[in-house]
A protein has these predicted regions:
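Structural marker of alpha-solenoid helical repeat scaffolds
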Residues: 23, 57-61
């Protein structure tokens, strides 16, 4: 997914990120990468939705570092 993003294939990268989240919802960094890619593609609402899913997952996992990053990314889009 990151390789697709680097090549500018954002729609394809987003599809891959969504698959990765579906297969491994406990891997928190994917939510941030997906949210950033959605925001880059112009889908602010989609980005916020994924970031908020990640915030929920990070809280459940007790991952304070990832939670902070996700909350910061969401706040930047909301602000």
């Amino acid at each position: 997914a990151m390789e697709l993003k680097k090549r500018g294939q954002l729609a394809e990268a987003i599809g891959e990120f969504r698959e990765l989240i579906a297969r491994n919802p406990g891997y928190i960094p994917t939510y941030l990468m997906a949210g950033n890619t959605l925001a880059e593609s112009g889908d602010r609402a989609g980005a916020l939705a994924v970031l908020h899913q990640g915030i929920t997952a990070a809280r459940a996992a007790g991952d304070a570092h990832a939670l902070g990053e996700l909350e910061s990314a969401a706040a930047a889009l909301e602000g």
